Structures are given as structure tokens and as C-alpha cells.
Amino acid sequence: YSQVLKLLDKEKILQISRETKGSEAYVKRFDGYQHLVVMLFGILKHFDSLRELEIGMKAEAHKLGHLGMNYLVRRSTLAEANIRRPQEFFASVYAYLLEKYAKFLADSRPAKSYKGQTHEPKDWEKLLYMMDSTTITLFDNILKGVGRHPKSGKKKGGMKVHTVMKYHVGVPMVVQLTSAAKHDHYLLKEVHLPKDSTLAMDRGYVDIAQFQRLTEEGVCYVTKMKKNLKYEVLESVMYVNTEGLVAHIDQKVRFTRGELIHEARRVEIFYANKKPVVLLTNNFDFTVEDIAEI
């Protein structure tokens, strides 16, 4: 644990805490750095409650000085800090650490030669981001009240974790927590990527207005297409393989939502023993193979 803390710049973290609105408000002793240290201690020890965390800290009381702690925090103090200190502080610390140590993270892209197969790195791999969500069911008795009542009468309780990850980094760039009932495309509104980036996502994130925003910002997206989307076909080309079978259909389509007009590329790929896959993108330069790989 002390080795982990050596990677943390205490003064920089305190600076982030002071610059985050409300992070150091009404704070006497339990500053942002000490709060971070305590929470990391609880995570690494796999504690599930503040009571466990308090007991664990007491058991390690003789080592607190080595952790940069100058006193033993009480459970009530920690509970109040969890309420008062804004999450933006921890998000800023994470962003700072990611920027500082990203170069030391393992590159998850396939090697140029692996198990006899060669892989030529593509230009788009360098700026490829992936977005997805995972639902966490909350089954403890104390958490059974979380969620909403749908028409079926069954409660959709739990949390949903929305994540944006850079392809070759392998750790989240953005993490948002919402109720399980929150629609996936919620996070899409919050995502702002560098120009010329490519964003891969599932069909749950389909939002024509946000797709137009990404296009205007110079960001490429690739996603699976929903069946119920209404669109107008502007151009259509059918490609046939050497066996005379349809390999894929490449179309330029237009979506109209009131005054909003968004033009995109619809690619339907056919397989011998599988259902066809329909993909949607705003990139008209990628090959069909690249789009399918993304």
C-alpha cells in the first residue's frame, strides 16, 4: 500500500482539492489527500462498509504516519466527508494520475506478430475509443428500494456504470454512475473527444442529434444500427463476392429530426452462417473491413 502512495504527489492532490469548488469547505483536518488515502485503503482491503474501514484503520493505527495521516479518522467524519466533498475532486485526481502515468501502461493493441499471425497497425487505432455500460444489481436488503417500477411490476433496481476507454490504454478515461433505469445515450452527451478520434459503441447509444454533434466536432463514430430508425437512402451500392453472393451493401442515408438533418453511412454485411450485421458511421473513407473491425 505504501508503494502505491509513493506514486501520489501529496501537494499536487491538495492543490487539486483546493481548486475544486466545495472540496475544502468546512474542513478542519480531514483534507482531500487524507480522504483519498483512506478510500484507497478501504478499496485495497476490500472493505464493504465504513465500520469495517474504521476498524481496519484502528488496527493499522501505528502505521498511519507512513501513510501521510496525522490522526485516526472517525466513521462519522468519513461519512460526512463522503457527502460534502464533491466527486469532481476524485475525478480530477484520476485524470491527473492517468495523464502522468499513461506512458507506463501496457499497450493492449495486438503485436505486429503474434502466434504466427501478423497485424499491421491502423492509423485509426491510435485514436480509437470504446464506450459501453454495465448494470450492477444491488441485492442487499438495504438497497432493495433503489430503482423504478416498470409496467411489469418488477423493480429495475441497481446501478449502471458508463465507461469510455481508449483502445490501446486499457483503463477507463471516463466513468459515470447512474441508476440502472438511465438510458445508455445519457453518457454520449457528456463525451467530448479529440478531433479525428473514432468512437465505437453499441446500439444503445444511438442518438441522431448527438451523432450530428460528433460529426461537427470532427469525431468519427461506428455503432450497430437500430431496426426502428427511419431514414432516407441517398445512394446505395451492392457488392458481390466471387461466388456471386451479396457480400455487403454500402449506403449513404439521411436522418431528419425536425430541423436537424444528419447524413451517415449505413453498411450491411452478410455472412454465410450468421445473421447480417448493420453498422452506422459518419465516416465515408473507411473500408468496410475497417468498419467491421472497429
Give the location of each predicted region.
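Major-groove recognition helix of helix-turn-helix-like DNA-binding domains
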Residues: L67-Q87
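Blade-loop segments of beta-propeller domains
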Residues: E60, L64-L67
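Short alpha-helical linear motifs
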Residues: S76-E80, E99-L105, Y239
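Single, function-defining residue in the core of a domain
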Residues: Y1-E52, G56, R85, S92-V93, ...
